[in-house]
């Protein structure tokens, strides 16, 4: 069972306790730091919508350390990022693989960052299906549709030709932050808070 630190703050009404993630949410910081699946995606979407309702003009910061996960769950987060009014800055800490890399590059252009020792990985979607031959065929067609959609999204956010994206995603494609910047997945590599602040001036 994982332990989540609690922060105690003094208020006019006395002490108030927050878990660390809730306290950071007050600073408009959202963490995507586990496997992307439906439950966590719903929580991330809810946080994005809450921060938009609180202040639609103030930026949101999404910190990503994820191995990827379920495509539809990731697309729920991605679509919400594009839907809401605030700009969403993304920052890779550790890893942004598979759907994690789509969320990373889906941040506001010019506000997509990576720390210097992170790893980023893109690849085509995978699926393993059992059952009747007709059902397997249906799922295979759906996987190909999702592959085409993801290729188009990566092409849009990296400004790379679709053919180049298709070739680059045929197998697991691991990148350093420098390679990810050259590819168009991130805009800047930062090593300090001050460096990030300078880029926002």
UniProtKB/Swiss-Prot annotation:
Substrates-to-products reaction catalysed: Hydrolysis of proteins to small peptides in the presence of ATP and magnesium. alpha-casein is the usual test substrate. In the absence of ATP, only oligopeptides shorter than five residues are hydrolyzed (such as succinyl-Leu-Tyr-|-NHMec, and Leu-Tyr-Leu-|-Tyr-Trp, in which cleavage of the -Tyr-|-Leu- and -Tyr-|-Trp bonds also occurs)
Localization of this protein: Cytoplasm
GO biological process, one term: protein quality control for misfolded or incompletely synthesized proteins
Keywords assigned: Cytoplasm, Hydrolase, Protease, Serine protease
EC number: 3.4.21.92
Annotated Gene Ontology cellular component terms: cytoplasm; endopeptidase Clp complex
Enzyme class per UniProt: hydrolase
Parts forming coiled coils: none
Stored SUPFAM superfamilies: ClpP/crotonase (SSF52096)
Entry-linked Pfam families: CLP_protease (PF00574)
GO MF term set: ATP-dependent peptidase activity; ATPase binding; serine-type endopeptidase activity
Transmembrane portions of the chain: none
InterPro entries: ClpP, ClpP/crotonase-like_dom_sf, ClpP/TepA, ClpP_His_AS, ClpP_Ser_AS
Location of the active site: 98, 123
Assembly and oligomerization: Fourteen ClpP subunits assemble into 2 heptameric rings which stack back to back to give a disk-like structure with a central cavity, resembling the structure of eukaryotic proteasomes.
Entries under PANTHER family matching the protein: ATP-DEPENDENT CLP PROTEASE PROTEOLYTIC SUBUNIT
Stated role: Cleaves peptides in various proteins in a process that requires ATP hydrolysis. Has a chymotrypsin-like activity. Plays a major role in the degradation of misfolded proteins.
Family: Belongs to the peptidase S14 family.
Name under which the protein is recorded: ATP-dependent Clp protease proteolytic subunit
UniProt organism field: Rickettsia typhi (strain ATCC VR-144 / Wilmington)
């Amino acid at each position: 069972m994982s332990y989540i630190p609690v922060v105690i703050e003094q208020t006019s009404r006395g002490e108030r306790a927050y878990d660390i993630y809730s306290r950071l949410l007050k600073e408009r910081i959202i963490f995507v730091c586990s496997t992307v699946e439906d439950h966590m995606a719903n929580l991330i979407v809810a946080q994005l919508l809450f921060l938009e309702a609180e202040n639609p003009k103030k930026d949101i910061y999404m910190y990503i350390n994820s191995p990827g996960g379920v495509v539809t769950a990731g697309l729920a987060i991605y679509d919400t990022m594009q839907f809401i009014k605030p700009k969403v800055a993304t920052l890779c800490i550790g890893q942004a693989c598979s759907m994690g890399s789509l969320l990373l590059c889906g941040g506001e252009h010019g506000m997509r960052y990576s720390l210097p020792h992170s790893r980023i990985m893109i690849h085509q979607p995978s699926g393993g299906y059992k059952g009747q031959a007709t059902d397997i065929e249906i799922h295979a067609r759906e996987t190909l549709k999702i592959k085409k959609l993801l290729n188009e999204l990566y092409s849009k956010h990296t400004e790379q030709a679709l053919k180049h994206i298709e070739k680059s995603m045929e197998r697991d494609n691991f990148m350093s932050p420098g390679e990810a910047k050259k590819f168009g997945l991130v805009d800047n590599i930062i090593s300090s808070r001050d460096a990030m602040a300078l880029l926002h001036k």
